[in-house]
Amino acid sequence: FSYLMQTKGETNLSLQLKFWGQDEWRTSEFDIYIDDHLLTSVNNSHRWRTTQFKTVDYAIPSEFVKGKKEVRVKFVAHKGKQVGQIYGVRLVKN
């Protein structure tokens, strides 16, 4: 799945994701892309083991957003895995 997100011309941004901390029955491994550029690979399988939300920021290289008013943020599960439960997706200034 993916989201089209507004950068407002900013280049010093992070992708902020909110995850549910307890996800014992899923194997959550996935890649995050910004306009088809790999931002990071994430493995949240059994990561927190808590019944709270967890927020993680991923710094976006300025060249991924330079000169753009919007970017597509795409989540792609690894083969045989899942993206997992994401409850918030935001672009934030660093």
Language model features by range: what are they?
Residues 1-12, 18-94:
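Beta-strand-rich ligand-recognition modules
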